[in-house]
Amino acid sequence: MKCLLCGQTMKTVLTFSSLLLLRNDDSCLCSDCDSTFERIGEENCPNCMKTELSTKCQDCQLWCKEGVGVSHRAIFTYNQAMKDFFSRYKFDGDFLLRKVFASFLSEELKKYKEYQFVVIPLSPDRYANRGFNQVEGLVEAAGFEYLDLLEKREERASSSKNRSERLGTELPFFIKSGVTIPKKILLIDDIYTTGATINRVKKLLEEAGAKDVKTFSLVR
């Protein structure tokens, strides 16, 4: 099997635990590539997992004042290796890379068995240009289904806006007509920065009747 990132041939090593549990190590990364990604450590904001903090961060305090209780979890930091990954996956359109973190996501998402998964959608133009929704790809590669509840209108890319600009614009997301809103939702995105997108959509779902909305991203 070859590493999906560098193409290096990987040796399959059967460990005692994998034999005992009758499962294979299904990692798509070689050890060299795997070592370039940084897991979020224990020192982080208890609400959004912002690193190198042990108390609620400033962003979460601001969200609290706006009536949003942040309850977010993520796996990795947004280091240079992760930036390079998303450059290839999202912007170069290498859809095969959706499988790179499948085993990591599977381990985390299985903790939310009582929740219905909902992914942050792309606008029609962005979807047409990219050819796929990168979040849907990650979730599907991890072996999970999601509900199609949301749509997004066209707008300027959020990555080109600062926090105040994101909050000052009308929310481009809306709930599709005729759908049933589950009581417990895990809202999933690829990257969490200030939380401007995912927390506003969280509030939208809560106002529509969801009783418990938690948020999740691959990267913080």
Curated annotation (Swiss-Prot):
Protein name (Swiss-Prot/TrEMBL)? Competence protein ComFC
Keyword annotations from UniProtKB, A to Z: Competence
Cytoplasm as a keyword?
A: no
Instruction: Cite the PANTHER family for this sequence.
Output: DNA UTILIZATION PROTEIN YHGH
CDD domains in the cross-refs: PRTases_typeI
Complex and partners: Monomer and dimer in solution. Interacts with ComFA and DprA; ComFA-ComFC form rings about 150 Angstroms in diameter with apparent 6-fold symmetry.
Instruction: State which gene encodes it.
Output: comFC
Role according to the record? Involved in transformation (genetic competence for DNA uptake).
Q: Which Gene3D superfamilies match?
A: 3.40.50.2020
Q: Which family does it belong to?
A: Belongs to the ComF/GntX family.
Q: What happens when the gene is disrupted?
A: Over 1000-fold decrease in transformation efficiency.
* Domain notes per entry: Oligomerizes via its C-terminal domain (residues 94-220).
Family matches, as InterPro entries: ComF/GntX_DNA_util-trans, PRibTrfase_dom, PRTase-like
User: What Pfam families does the record point to?
Assistant: Pribosyltran (PF00156)
